[in-house]
Amino acid sequence: MACQRHLLFLLLVLFAVSTQLSHGQHWSHGWYPGGKRELDMPASPEVSEEIKLCEGEECAYLRNPRKNLLKNILGRSNQKKNADVLARQLQKK
């Protein structure tokens, strides 16, 4: 009888743990945790207008913000270039 109780308790614990592990986010093809989508995929009808307008190197939406931060910290010589890019972006809007 005591052995059956231990077995029942073990099964209950395993069931509880397995249900907690299965609550993870389902990853669809091309999607990453947090709803972030891979941008290197071919264009689809779901692509927003902002992404469609961003087809050059100067697009702020497709840039990695960490890269920009690192560039700004390491070298201040690009300030004029950054100001020109910002001015062009403001003119486009």
Curated annotation (Swiss-Prot):
Keywords: Amidation, Cleavage on pair of basic residues, Hormone, Pyrrolidone carboxylic acid, Secreted, Signal
InterPro entries recorded: GnRH (IPR002012), Gonadoliberin (IPR019792)
Tissue-specific expression: Midbrain and hindbrain.
This protein's record includes keyword Signal: yes
Modified residues (Pyrrolidone carboxylic acid): 25
Listed Pfam families: GnRH
Leader sequence residues: 1-24
Subcellular location, principal: secreted
Modified residues (Glycine amide): 34
GO annotation (BP), single: reproductive process
A GO term for molecular function: gonadotropin hormone-releasing hormone activity
Recorded coiled-coil stretches: none
Function, in words: Stimulates the secretion of gonadotropins.
UniProt family annotation: Belongs to the GnRH family.
Name of this protein: Progonadoliberin-2
Species annotation: Aquarana catesbeiana
Lineage: Eukaryota, Metazoa, Chordata, Craniata, Vertebrata
